[in-house]
A protein has these predicted regions:
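GHKL/Bergerat-fold ATPase module in large chromosome/replication-associated machines
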Residues: 117, 135-158, 178-181, 188-691
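GHKL (Bergerat-fold) ATPase N-terminal catalytic module, capturing the glycine-rich phosphate-binding loop
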Residues: 1-185, 192, 199, 215-222, ...
Length: 691
C-alpha cells in the first residue's frame, strides 16, 4: 500500500489534552484498556477457528506480551489475535475508536463523580494517549493475502499509515511515553498495575523488560517441553559412598542417582490466572481452594468464616464469590471490599450502584458480563436490570444464612458474633433483606444460649416455669380479669443488657427469679432494635435497668408510703438533687440495697447521640437527652433499714451518697470527679469501722 496521511477529526485538537487532564488520577487504566483489546482479538480468532472460518495451528496458544523499556521510554503490548487489515485500521482505529473516545469525553468530561462511568470503562485504544506523546500500531490480519500495516499518531489531528514489516498474525501497539508517565515503563510498576486490572483475564499475560539479559533455569530432561530453548545438556553421574553393611563389611552404596538435566532459557510465568475460582462450578471447588483464593485476592491471612458461590446464567449472567470475614473485636474495621469484574476484567471496587450497600461489609468478587458499563453511575441507580442484579445477590445471601440456620444451627451460632453486625446493618439498609432474615436473627442471652426472636417470644411451657414465674403468671391473670376487655394487650417485653459486667447486679436479680435477658453490646444494636420495634407492634425492647419488673418485687410486704416519703427526703437532701425520683420497694433479694433505673427512651436517645458524636457527625449534646433516673431502695435491706431508722444520724448523708454511687456503677461509669469522691468516701466508711 502507498503511504497515507489522514485527519482524525476537525474537532480533535482538544481531545488528547482532555484525556490527559480529565483522567489524571486514573492514568493506569490504559493498561487495562489495551490488554483487554488484545484479549478480545484472541477470543475472536478462536471463535473463527471454532466456526471453521479460520484454521489455527495445532500448537496455537493465545497470549499477550507486555514489553517495557525504561531506557527507550516505551511500552509494547503485543497479542497474537486476529490482527487488522489497512481498511480495518482505517475503520476501527481512525474512525470508530476515535469517534467512541470523542463521544466518551464529550459526554462525561464535565460531569460530577456521581455521573462518571464506573472505572472509566470504555475509553478503549485512545486511553494510550493519557501517557504517551506518540502511539504506533503494527498489525497483520489473519485474512488470506493480508499485508502488514503500520499506523502512527503523535497526539495531534493527523495520523500516518503505511506498509509494515510484521511477520506474524496479531497486533503490536507501541507507546512512546511522555516524561510525566515514565513510571509505567518500570517493570515493577507495570506488574503492579497489570495485576490490579488483569489478574483474571482469560488470556495469559506475560511481562518482560525489553532487551534484558536472558535468565536460565535447570530442569530434569524428562520435563522438557517443545517450547523450551535448550542452552546446555548436563549429565551428572551417580554418587557413591563407602558404608558398612549388616555383616560389618564395607561396600559402595549409591547416595545420589545419575541425573540428566537441561539448562534452558527461563520459562516465562503468566501474571494472571485465566480460570479464576468463580468461573468454576461450586461442586468443582474445594474448601482449601476457596481459602487460598481469599488469601490471594484480599491479602488477608485470617481464614474467612464461610462463603457464598454465586453462579447464575439466566435471566442474566452473574458469577462470583462472597466471603464473610472474621472480625476479632468490635473495634476491628468491618469495611469490606467487593471487586466488580466484567468478563474477568477488573472494573472497580465497591460500586454501590450495583452492589447493595450492606454487602460492602463483606469481601468478594462479582463478575457480570451483562452489566451496562458505558453508562454513568447515576444512570445505574435507576436501571431496572441493575436493580434485579442487586436483588438477586441480596436473596442469595439471605438464602445462605437461612439455610445454615435451618440445617447447621451449631455452625450458625458459632459464626453469629462475627456476622451479626453485617446482618443487622443489612436489616437497617434493606427492607426486603430484613423481611427475609428477620426470624433467623439470633440473640445471645445471659445464659449463653442463642435464640431467635420467635423463640424468645414463645410462651414458656407450664412444666418449664419456675415457681416465681408461675406465681407471677397467676397474679397477672388476676389483674387481667379486672382490666377493661377492650384495652389493647400489652406488648411483649424483651429485656436486654449492654454490658454484662457493669449490669451484673441486674443480671443476678433476673437469674434468681428465672428471668432472661439478651445481650446487645454492639454499637449498631440501638439502631437495630429501634427499627425492629417500628416494624413490629407486638413486642418492645427494654434494657434490664430501665425498670424493675414485678417479678423482682415481694408484694407481701408492709405498706411503704411513709418509708418512701422519709427516704426520698433524706436522699434528695444528701445528693442535693430535688429532681431525683426515689422509690422504696420490697425486693426479693435482701442483699441488694439500691437499684438505679433509667428510662429506656431517654437512655436510648443518649446512646444515639454518643454514636453520632463518635462517628464525627456532630449533632446535639447527649446531656440534652439525660435519661430520667429513679433510685429504688430495698426495704428488705439492712442498710436501708438503718438509714430509715436513723435518718438524723451524721453518717446517713454519707451512706446515702454511697448507695447512690453503688447503684450508678451498675448503670454506667462514674465521672472522674464522682469516682474521686467515691474512693474517698469508701475510705471514710472503712475508717468508721475501725472506731
Amino acid at each position: 500500500m502507498t503511504e497515507k496521511h489522514g485527519n482524525l477529526s476537525i474537532d480533535s485538537d482538544n481531545l488528547f489534552p482532555i484525556i490527559k487532564k480529565w483522567l489524571y488520577s486514573d492514568h493506569d487504566i490504559f493498561y487495562r484498556e489495551l490488554i483487554s483489546n488484545g484479549c478480545d482479538a484472541i477470543t475472536k480468532l478462536k471463535k473463527l477457528d471454532m466456526m471453521g472460518e479460520y484454521s489455527l495451528p495445532a500448537d496455537y496458544k493465545g497470549k499477550i506480551q507486555v514489553l517495557v523499556n525504561p531506557d527507550e521510554k516505551t511500552i509494547k503490548i503485543i497479542d497474537n489475535g486476529l490482527g487488522m487489515t489497512a481498511d480495518e485500521v482505517e475503520e476501527y482505529i481512525s474512525r470508530i475508536a476515535f469517534s467512541g473516545a470523542t463521544d466518551f469525553i464529550e459526554k462525561y468530561k464535565d460531569k460530577s463523580n456521581d455521573d462518571q462511568i464506573i472505572g472509566h470503562f470504555g475509553l478503549g485504544f485512545y486511553s494510550a494517549f493519557m501517557v504517551a506523546d506518540e502511539v504506533t500500531i503494527d498489525t497483520l490480519s489473519y485474512k488470506e493475502g493480508s499485508t502488514p500495516v503500520h499506523w502512527s499518531c503523535d497526539g495531534g489531528t493527523e495520523y500516518n499509515m503505511e506498509d509494515g514489516d510484521m511477520d506474524d498474525v496479531g497486533t503490536e501497539i507501541t507507546l512512546y511515553l511522555n516524561d510525566d508517565c515514565l513510571e509505567f515503563a518500570n517493570e515493577y510498576r507495570a506488574r503492579e498495575v497489570i495485576e490490579k486490572y488483569c489478574s483474571f483475564m482469560p488470556t495469559e499475560i506475560y511481562l518482560a523488560k525489553e532487551n534484558a539479559p536472558e535468565e536460565y533455569e535447570t530442569i530434569d530432561k524428562a520435563d522438557k517441553r517443545d517450547t523450551d530453548t535448550v542452552i546446555e545438556e548436563i549429565h551428572e553421574d551417580a554418587k557413591y559412598e563407602e558404608k558398612e553393611n549388616d555383616k560389618g563389611e564395607k561396600e559402595q552404596v549409591e547416595v545420589s542417582p545419575a541425573k540428566d538435566q537441561l539448562k534452558i532459557v527461563k520459562r516465562p510465568v503468566p501474571l494472571n490466572d485465566t480460570t479464576p475460582l468463580w468461573t468454576k462450578s461450586p461442586n468443582e471447588c474445594t474448601d482449601e481452594e476457596y481459602k487460598e483464593f481469599y488469601r490471594k485476592v484480599f491479602l488477608d491471612y485470617k481464614e474467612p468464616l464461610f462463603w457464598i458461590h454465586l453462579n447464575m446464567d439466566y435471566p442474566f449472567n452473574l458469577k462470583g464469590i462472597l466471603y464473610f470475614p472474621k472480625i476479632n473485636t468490635e473495634y476491628d474495621s468491618i469495611e469490606g471490599t467487593i471487586k466488580l469484574y466484567n468478563n474477568q476484567v477488573f472494573i472497580a471496587d465497591n460500586i454501590k450502584e450495583v452492589i447493595p450497600e450492606f454487602l460492602m461489609l463483606l469481601k468478594g468478587v462479582i463478575d457480570c458480563p451483562d452489566l451496562p458499563l458505558n453508562v454513568s453511575r447515576s444512570a445505574l441507580q435507576n436501571d431496572g436490570f441493575v436493580k434485579k442484579i442487586s436483588e438477586y445477590i441480596t436473596k442469595k445471601v439471605a438464602d445462605k444464612l437461612i439455610g445454615m440456620c435451618k440445617t447447621d444451627k451449631e455452625a450458625y451460632e458459632k459464626y453469629w458474633d462475627d456476622i451479626s453486625p453485617f446482618i443487622k446493618f443489612g436489616c437497617l439498609k434493606d427492607e426486603k433483606f430484613c423481611d427475609k432474615i428477620n426470624d433467623y436473627i439470633l440473640f445471645k442471652d445471659i445464659n449463653d444460649k442463642y435464640q431467635t426472636l420467635p423463640e424468645l417470644l414463645a410462651p414458656v411451657a407450664e412444666d418449664e416455669k419456675t415457681d416465681a414465674e408461675s406465681a407471677d403468671a397467676s397474679d397477672d391473670a388476676k389483674k387481667a380479669d379486672n382490666t377493661d376487655e377492650n384495652k389493647e394487650p400489652e406488648k411483649n417485653t424483651v429485656y436486654y443488657v449492654t454490658d454484662v459486667v457493669q449490669q451484673g447486679q441486674y443480671i443476678k436479680l433476673f437469674k434468681e427469679q428465672g428471668m432472661n435477658a439478651v445481650i446487645l453490646d454492639h454499637n449498631i444494636d440501638t439502631s437495630f432494635i429501634t427499627q425492629l420495634e417500628q416494624r413490629n407492634d407486638h413486642y418492645k425492647f427494654m434494657r434490664i435497668d430501665a425498670d424493675l419488673t414485678e417479678s423482682l418485687k415481694d408484694e407481701s410486704g408492709a405498706d411503704l408510703t411513709e418509708a418512701t416519703s422519709t427516704l426520698s427526703e433524706v436522699f434528695k437532701k444528701a445528693l442535693n438533687n430535688d429532681k431525683l425520683t426515689v422509690k422504696v420497694e420490697n425486693l426479693k433479694n435482701a442483699d441488694v440495697a439500691s437499684v438505679l433505673t433509667l428510662s429506656e427512651q431517654g437512655r436510648r436517645m443518649q446512646d444515639m447521640m454518643k454514636m453520632y458524636a463518635a462517628g464525627g457527625m456532630g449533632g446535639m449534646d447527649p446531656s440534652m437527652f439525660a435519661a430520667d433516673q429513679t433510685l429504688t431502695l430495698n426495704a428488705n435491706n439492712e442498710l436501708v433499714k438503718y438509714i430509715l431508722d436513723n435518718k438524723d444520724s451524721e453518717h446517713v448523708p454519707m451512706f446515702a451518697e454511697q448507695l447512690y454511687d453503688l447503684a450508678m456503677l451498675s448503670n454506667q461509669p462514674l465521672s472522674v470527679d464522682q469516682m474521686t469522691k467515691f474512693v474517698k468516701r469508701s475510705n471514710d466508711i472503712m475508717l468508721l469501722l475501725t472506731k
